[in-house]
Amino acid sequence: MSNSRKMSEPPRFFVGPEDAEINPGNYRRFFHHAEEEEEEEDESPPERQIVVGICSMAKKSKSKPMKEILERISLFKYITVVVFEEEIILNEPVENWPLCDCLISFHSKGFPLDKAVAYAKLRNPFVINDLNMQYLIQDRRDVYSILQAEGILLPRYAILNRDPNNPKECNLIEGEDHVEVNGEVFQKPFVEKPVSAEDHNVYIYYPTSAGGGSQRLFRKIGSRSSVYSPESNVRKTGSYIYEEFMPTDGTDVKVYTVGPDYAHAEARKSPALDGKVERDSEGKEVRYPVILNAREKLIAWKVCLAFKQTVCGFDLLRANGQSYVCDVNGFSFVKNSMKYYDDCAKILGNIVMRELAPQFHIPWSIPLEAEDIPIVPTTSGTMMELRCVIAVIRHGDRTPKQKMKMEVRHQKFFDLFEKCDGYKSGKLKLKKPKQLQEVLDIARQLLMELGQNNDSEIEENKSKLEQLKTVLEMYGHFSGINRKVQLTYLPHGCPKTSSEEEDNRREEPSLLLVLKWGGELTPAGRVQAEELGRAFRCMYPGGQGDYAGFPGCGLLRLHSTYRHDLKIYASDEGRVQMTAAAFAKGLLALEGELTPILVQMVKSANMNGLLDSDSDSLSSCQQRVKARLHEILQKDRDFTAEDYEKLTPSGSISVIKSMHLIKNPVKTCDKVYSLIQSLTSQIRYRMEDPKSADIQLYHSETLELMLRRWSKLEKDFKTKNGRYDISKIPDIYDCIKYDVQHNGSLKLENTMELYRLSKALADIVIPQEYGITKAEKLEIAKGYCTPLVRKIRSDLQRTQDDDTVNKLHPVYSRGVLSPERHVRTRLYFTSESHVHSLLSILRYGALCDDSKDEQWKRAMDYLNVVNELNYMTQIVIMLYEDPNKDLSSEERFHVELHFSPGAKGCEEDKNLPSGYGYRPASRENEGRRSLKTDDDEPHTSKRDEVDRAVMLFKPLVSEPIHIHRKSPLPRSRKITANEVVSENANYLRTPRNLVEQKQNPTVGFELYSMVPSICPLETLHNALFLKQVDDFLASIASPSTEVLRKVPEMSSMATRSSPGMRRKISLNTYTPTKILPTPPAALKSSKASSKAAAGGPSQAMAPHTSSRKKSINSKTEGHEPKKSTGKKR
C-alpha cells in the first residue's frame, strides 16, 4: 500500500473479536484463508510460502510478546517466519543473511542499523517499519520536528544545542525559578530531556515555592523509575530539549499502533509521581487499556504514517483538555495482552498477504470482521451506583500564625525595595529563599554595626531586628512560603499613633516592614491528612475491606484501572496545598516526597475566587457583626437574657454552653490575661534555667520564640485603655491549643485552664464572626462561597463522562467486572472561612424543612452542638445513580450529605457531640446479592465483588459505621494478577490509630504520638434527590447561575488562559533551601550607609520581571485576609 494512497484515506479503526483470549485450537480460523477447506481437497502442488524475516537483537526477537505474535503469524497458511540469529546480524556480512520476502527489522541498543539498511537495499524485501526513518527516531529533535510538521500538539519546547568542546558557550540563562533557552522562557516546573532518544535520564525541575529540587527519571531498575533529588540547577554539559511541564494528574498514556488504522492504548502511573513502579503478583508493571478519543485516534494515524512505522509506540499526555505527544519510541509491542497479540498478528499477516499475495499468485481475500458490540452491563433489583464524590476539607494541624511590624529607614532596605521593583506599586512581597536571604543579610549587618558602635546612627529597633534575624534563621533553611516579608513605601513615614508625640514624628519617607511566619502545616498535620486520605478510600465501593484483604482497596482498584476521574483543588496557602498533597498520598497509596505529588496532582484554585476570598477587607455586613459582637463581649457583667438573645438568635447550643461557662466576659478575659502573664513568666524562668538552655520545642521552635509569641499576645490583648481586644481571642486559643498539644513536655502550669477559658471565648467569637442572625450568616457565607457553590453544582450536573477522561477499554479488560463504571471525585482543600460558610449555606439556605423532614431535624440538632470546625473538617457530598429508574425520573439520581468536625481537641474534650453515625443509604454490605457468573475461575466473583459500585438502597441503617474504625488485619490470600498491590504493601497494614498515646508525649519521630485523631463522618442526610439539591444550589448561586451552568473543569479553563496562567503553583513543602552565611565582604561594608535618602523611585530601575513571576509573587501571598479574628485559620 503506497503512502500516498494511505494518506488520502480517512483514519479507519478496527479491533478484533470480543473473545479476549483465543486458545490455539480456535484461532486457526482467524488466520487461515476463508476457503481453506476447499483448497485442501484439491491435490494441486503447494503454493510458494511467503517468508517473513525478523531482524533484531536477540533480547527483542526472543521476548515474550514477539514470540506470542510470531506464533500467531505462523498460523497463516502461506506465511513462514524466519528469525535472524543475533550472531549472524552482528558478525556476518549482509550477503550471508537469510533471504526473506518481508522484513520486520527495528533498532535497539547495539543493533547495526546500517547493515539492516544495506540488506534491505540488496534484497529489496517488503519492509514493515521503514529503516531510514529509524535514524530520525533516535534523535528527539528530529522527532519533534516531524510531529510539528504533521500538526500534532506538542508541549511548548526549545532546543539547547551545546558544542561538546565548548559547553559554556550556549544560549542558556538560568534563574532561580526559570530557564531562558534561545529567548524562550520556561518557568518551573519544566522538563529537561537529552536530545538522544536512547538517553532516558529525563529531569523535571520544581519551583522553589513547591520545595525546589528535581525528579530524575530513568529506565526502570527493579521497582523504581525515578528518584527525587534536592538539586535544582540544570545540567551544564550535553544538548537538551526544555519543555513546559504538563499536569496530567499522575497518569501517562502509551499508545501502540499496528498500521495506521489500529491503536491500543494503555495508561500507567506516571514515573514522575513517586518513582515507584506498580507491579502485579507476577512482577509485571501494572497497566490498564484505555479508550482513545477521536482526536487521539487521528494522532495515532498521523504518527504511524509520518514516521513510516507500521508497528509504533508513542507517549501521550492528557492535560488541560488536550492530548500532547511527548515521545515516539518506534517499534514496540504491548506486554501481557492476549487480545493485542491476536489483533497484532492478524493485522500484520493481512498487511503481508495483501502486499505480496498477488506477486506469489496466492488467492487471498481479507476476512471482514463484525463491528465490536459494546458491553453493556445490566443490573436487577433496586441497585445504586456511586457516580460522584465531592468533599470540601479544611487544612491540617498548623503552627500558630504570627506577625511583626517595624518601620525601617536604612538605605539598605530602600536599595532592596528598588532592586525588586517595589516602587511600581509601592508594595513588595518577598518570600523566595534568595530574597529572604537578602533581608537576613541586611538584618545581620545592621545588628553587627549596632553591636560595634552603640552611638550608631541606625534607627531601626534593635530588638525587632533581632527578632527578624531569629525568625529568618529558624529551621536552618528556607522552606516554601513558611515565612514572608512585606515592604510598603510610606512617603511621609508611619502615621501618628496614640502613644506617639506629634513633635517627635518624622515626615521623611520610610518603609513599613511586616514579617509574617508560622501558619505552616506541621508534621502532625501531614500525618492527619495522609491518614484521612487512607480512611477516605473506605467510602468507595468495596471500601470496607470485607472482600479485599485491606480497607479501601475498592478505590485503589477503581483508580488504578483508570475508572476514577480525580481532581484535587487547593487554595494558594502553603498549608492548604501541602494538606492536599499529603491527603492524595494516603488516598492513592503513593510513596516518597510530597513535592512531585503536589506539582502533578494538586491544582491551584484561586481563579474565580473558588477557594480564596477575593476581597482584602471585611464586608459591611461582617463589620457590623464584628462591632456588635465586640460590644456585647466588652460588658463587665454576667450575660443577661437579652445578651443570649442578641448573641445567639439562632439558638446554637454550643454558643449557649460557652456563654454559661463564661458568665461575665470581662472577668473571663481578666483571667485569661493573668494566665498569659503567668505563662510568660514561667517561660522566662525556664530560659534562665541552665538545664533548659538547649531545649528544642516542637517543629524547631525555641523557648525564645515561644516567649515572643506569648509576649506579643500579652501586649496586644489588653489595650492601653484597659479594654480587651476581642479579635485576639482566636489567636490566644490557637497558641494554647498548639502548646497543649505539641509542647506538653514543658509541663507549664495552668495551661489546661487557659485552654478551657480561651476555647469557651473562641467558641463564641469564631462562629459568630460569620454572622449572628441566620440572614447575616447566609449573606456572609454567600460572599465567601458563591464560586465554590457554582462549581459543586457543575460537578453534580456533569454525570456524563467527557472524552478527556481516561476510560477503561471494556474489550481488553480482564478481571475487571465493571469496566464501564466511572466515578468522579472532586476534592477542595481550603481554610476555615470556606468551611464555616459552606456549612452555614447548608444549614440556613433552606435545603430541607426540618419541621417536615425528621432526618434533617436530627442533623440540625447535631450541628447545633458542634462547637468547633477544627483542622481536617470535612463536608462530603455523594451522588448515586439508580440505573433501573427512567432517565427523566427524579428518583434516578440520589444525593447524600456527610460531615465531620475534624480533629478531636485536647485531652479534656471528653464530651464530643455524637451524631447518628455514618449511614450511607446505599451500603453495599446491606442485603448484598450473590453474583452469578459464567467465569471459569471460582474465586473471581468474590474478588470482583469488591469492584462493584452497585449497592442495595435502604433508607436507614441504624448501626453507625465510622470510616476511622480500626480495620481487621488483612487475611492471607493469593492476590490475582489484575489487582494493583505494590510489593511493598505499606498500605496493607491496619491504618495507624491516629493517636491517643498520651503516656509518653515526646516519643516518636517528629512527635507522631501527638497527632489528634479525627472525628468520624456523620451522615446529615441520605435521601435527597439531585433535582432538589440542584435547585437549592442554583438559588444560592443566583443571580448569575445560568452563566455558570456550563462551568468547565478548572483544567480546561486554564488552557484557554495565557500560558503563564496554565499552571499556577503556590505551594509549601519541607524540602529545604539552606540558609547561607552572609558573605564577609558584605559585612565589611562601610558604616557610612546613609540613613534614608530615598525620597522616591530612583531612575535606575531593576530589570523588568516577567509577568509570570509577578503573578506568582502577587497571588501566593497570604494577604492579611479579612483583618479579622477567625479568618483563614
Curated annotation (Swiss-Prot):
Residues 1081-1098 have a biased composition (Low complexity). The keyword Nucleotide-binding applies. It catalyses: 1D-myo-inositol hexakisphosphate + ATP = 1-diphospho-1D-myo-inositol 2,3,4,5,6-pentakisphosphate + ADP; 5-diphospho-1D-myo-inositol 1,2,3,4,6-pentakisphosphate + ATP + H(+) = 1,5-bis(diphospho)-1D-myo-inositol 2,3,4,6-tetrakisphosphate + ADP. ATP binds at residues 140, 193, 200, 219, 243-246, 252-254, 270, 315, 327-329. Pfam families: His_Phos_2, PPIP5K2_N. The keyword Nucleotide-binding applies. Transmembrane segments: none annotated. Gene3D superfamilies: 3.40.50.11950, ATP-grasp fold, B domain, Phosphoglycerate mutase-like. GO terms for molecular function: 5-diphosphoinositol pentakisphosphate 1-kinase activity; ATP binding; inositol hexakisphosphate 1-kinase activity; inositol hexakisphosphate 5-kinase activity; inositol hexakisphosphate kinase activity; inositol-1,3,4,5,6-pentakisphosphate kinase activity. The modification Phosphoserine is found at S44, S229, S1051, S1058, S1066, S1106, S1107. GO terms for biological process: inositol metabolic process; sensory perception of sound. InterPro entries: Acid_Pase_AS, His_Pase_clade-2, His_Pase_VIP1, His_PPase_superfam, VIP1_N. The C-terminal acid phosphatase-like domain binds PtdIns(3,4,5)P3 and InsP6. Despite its similarity with the phosphatase domain of histidine acid phosphatases, it has no phosphatase activity. This is Inositol hexakisphosphate and diphosphoinositol-pentakisphosphate kinase 2. It comes from Mus musculus (Mouse).
